[in-house]
């Protein structure tokens, strides 16, 4: 009976009564999941790039460097120093927004040989895990208090009928932005997890 009560306590994520090891365990799961998504994003982007001609790669990369991802509108640390200074809750909140911004667009991430629906379920699981961590680390603070009304459009006209060149550019943009954002989330969650170990060196 005592073991059942303990298990329910862990699942309820009452941070005030939970030892730090419980949060570390949840962080480890979240970091592992986003690492998998980041690797998947890298692979799909590489597969798409390898299907292009050299000149196409050069032109698309040039355009992408001048363009923005939808998620660039989410306020986040500008460099590694600001990342290290950010609170655990802030890093979790930004990570949550980044993952949430891909819920709709991820349905079109079929740039590789893996099943089309592979990414979306993994994103949903990661989003749920981050939300649990946010609740565990809130300590009474209001979640997303700085920009709770922010809503990002799902890559606008990606689903409209486009010419061949424009469709190619949009696919490149989608895959490149997804890879970029999963790298961000992996970095933020890794730093936040490290913060739970006072003696750890969290230098990026």
UniProtKB/Swiss-Prot annotation:
Predominant place of localization: secreted
The GO cellular component terms are:
extracellular space
Molecular function terms, GO-annotated: growth hormone activity; growth hormone receptor binding; metal ion binding
Instruction: Please give the residue positions where the record annotates the modification Pyrrolidone carboxylic acid.
Output: 18
Stretches of the chain forming a coiled coil according to its record = none
Pfam families attached to this UniProt entry:
Hormone_1
Where found, per UniProt? Secreted
Q: Where is the signal peptide?
A: 1-17
Return the InterPro entries for the record.
4_helix_cytokine-like_core, Somatotropin, Somatotropin/Prolactin, Somatotropin_CS
A Gene Ontology biological process in which this protein takes part is: positive regulation of receptor signaling pathway via JAK-STAT
Record key words, sorted: Disulfide bond, Hormone, Metal-binding, Pyrrolidone carboxylic acid, Secreted, Signal, Zinc
Which superkingdom?
Eukaryota
Q: Which Gene3D superfamilies match?
A: 1.20.1250.10
Tell me the disulfide pairings in this chain. Answer: 69-177, 194-202
Q: Where does Zn(2+) bind?
A: 36, 186
- According to its UniProt record, which protein family does this protein belong to? Belongs to the somatotropin/prolactin family.
Protein's job: Growth hormone plays an important role in growth control and is involved in the regulation of several anabolic processes. Implicated as an osmoregulatory substance important for seawater adaptation.
What this protein is called in its record is Somatotropin
Organism name: Lates calcarifer (Barramundi)
Gene transcribed to yield this protein:
gh
